[in-house]
């Protein structure tokens, strides 16, 4: 989907913006709390008032800011539905904070965490520990993915982590491709039409976008029907197609 990308210049303020935490709960205070409010109140408010945007917003951080962005997930109703945390310098208590909150969160969240085997040792170790915690969460509202790279060091990691994390963040939004068809759809024991409906419902639930079912996706479901000779499903599929494309007609010769 189309996105508006906002960058914040932190050339001389990165530490005080993202790393001033209290000594007891290890949560933002003073300048870091102010920076949190600046994003939550000023930036989000400005773009909400001046642009037509959905409720699905993504925040990206690396190292100190990768830890900082996690604080947005500790609210009951996070303002960000997508978080990309690249090589986070994890603060004390953060692992337990995230594990506890994401286990019971009611909002739809897409969370992508990344590091490298050649990252700083302390960061890589802590990220791997967080990965284990988040992998164990059983919550249908959380879509969590960890990306552990092999060759990139701490400074080159963003060059591969950013595009791969974005791809993961929007993976559910993509049209059906051969990989999805071969690995999932072709092995379905339930109706492929129901799968298609559910796929687009998830897109709406996670991304707050009412996406029209693509003709490409109708074609893949039709292919399943033909391959398996479940021709009785044509009626169900045609009703859905007419609902999505009432003005469209395709003549198929076989």
What is the predicted function of each stretch?
Residues 1-254:
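Non-catalytic cap/lid and distal C-terminal segments of serine-dependent acyl enzymes
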């Amino acid at each position: 989907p189309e996105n508006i990308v906002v960058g914040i210049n932190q050339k001389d303020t990165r530490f005080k913006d993202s790393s001033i935490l209290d000594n007891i709960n290890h949560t933002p205070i003073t300048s870091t709390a102010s920076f949190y409010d600046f994003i939550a109140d000023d930036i989000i408010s400005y773009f909400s008032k001046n642009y037509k945007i959905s409720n699905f917003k993504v925040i990206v951080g690396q190292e100190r800011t990768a830890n900082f962005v996690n604080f947005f997930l500790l609210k009951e109703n996070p303002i960000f539905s997508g978080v990309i945390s690249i090589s986070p310098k994890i603060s004390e208590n953060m692992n337990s904070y995230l594990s506890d909150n994401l286990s019971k969160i009611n909002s739809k969240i897409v969370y992508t965490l990344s590091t490298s085997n050649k990252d700083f040792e302390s960061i890589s170790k802590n990220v791997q520990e967080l990965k284990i915690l988040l992998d164990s969460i059983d919550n249908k509202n959380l879509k969590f993915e960890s990306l552990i790279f092999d060759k990139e060091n701490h400074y080159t990691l963003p060059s591969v982590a950013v595009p791969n994390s974005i791809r993961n963040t929007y993976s559910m939004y993509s049209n059906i491709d051969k990989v999805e068809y071969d690995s999932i759809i072709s092995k379905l024991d339930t109706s492929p039409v129901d799968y298609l409906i559910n796929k687009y419902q998830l897109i709406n639930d996670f991304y707050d976008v009412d996406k029209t079912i693509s003709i490409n996706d109708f074609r893949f479901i039709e292919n399943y029907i033909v391959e398996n000779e479940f021709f009785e499903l044509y009626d169900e599929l045609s009703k859905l197609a007419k609902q999505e494309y009432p003005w469209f007609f395709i003549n198929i010769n076989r």
